[in-house]
Amino acid sequence: MSGQKKKLSWRRRLKIIRDICRGLMCIHRMKIVHRDLKSANCLVNKHWTAKICDFGLSRAMTDSPLIESSAAGTPEWMAPELMRNEPFTEKCDIFSLGVIMWELCTLSRPWEGISPVQVMYAVATEGSRLEIPEGPFGKLIADCWAEPENRPSCQEILTRLLDCEYAVS
């Protein structure tokens, strides 16, 4: 992504985030948790429309939080509850969406130069998070990285993105 700095306007970044958020809203309505949401699993076409792909680690939701016997996903984007093999809901995807938003704001790779094992320890054990960027997205990203029950819904994120859009236009 860092090579795209000149080409990726704020308008395009917002469109990508909105598209991913709408896609997440659809799969969550179908009672599916993706569990491996990351920028590499979001395809962008020539019209800058983003689509979520690679549902290999996804799970069907139940009425109670799900539990897996082993961690699954990509550490740099993974929610701490998944890293710790704790019960999880669709809110683990919201954490990952926050990392994608961070990427699109900073145009940097998350946890650059840090091994996946170190990332898992830092996030799951020490509660470390990437540095929150300045600007209108900062609070939204921080909220996506809150405890699962305090993370916003996809609908709330879409609403809050309107405020971000006004701030950057």
Q: How would you describe each model-predicted region?
A:
Residues T106-P110:
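Structural helix C-cap motif within protein kinase domains
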Residues E147-S169:
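Terminal C-lobe "cap" of eukaryotic-type protein kinase domains
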Residues R22-I32:
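Protein kinase catalytic-loop region centered on the HRD/HxD motif
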Residues E68-E81:
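Conserved activation segment of eukaryotic-like protein kinases, specifically the C-terminal portion
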Residues D93:
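Conserved catalytic-loop aspartate of Hanks-type protein kinases
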